Amino acid sequence: MKYLKVYLLSFFLLLNYLKVNSSDNINDIKSLLEGRYELVYWTENKIQYDYPEVAGVLVINDNNALITMDKNMNSNKSVELIGWGRYKINSNSFYIGWHDWKLLMIENNLKTVKKKSPWKGMREYSVSLKDDKLVLTSVTGKQSWELDKKSLVYSDKEWGEEKDEVIRYWKRIQ
């Protein structure tokens, strides 16, 4: 009976330790993820574009997401985007989806509006936290977010209809 009490006490202490560390872990993850970001540059097919050719704002906070982007890399074609979404995160997984998406393309003075989200439902990512760096990797391995206290680097190996490889560097503004 004495040993049973010791084992039970040890078990409950271990559970409390894991619960506290799990809570601290999710707080560390959220502190790196949540914030406001400004797009600094965009690399598409190994060509870097800076402001004013590209501009954008990303806000991730309290399970809500907002993104705006302007892409003016070609004088005859521009793309403007605004999206509202939701996300969920825990210490193992991150999910994000865009339930309201508006993409305005202007090419040779012709305007086209697309209101379809780039994917259905929520995209799933694995979560890795190491040395004050948060890495989110999609289950396909084609998209990733790397976040620290100063920045977010988003990489996509198949972005858009043309399936271009892009890297977007965002600085944290709050």
Q: Residues of each region from the PLM?
A:
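Bacterial Sec-dependent N-terminal signal peptides
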Residues: 1-28
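Lipid interaction determinants
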Residues: 20-174
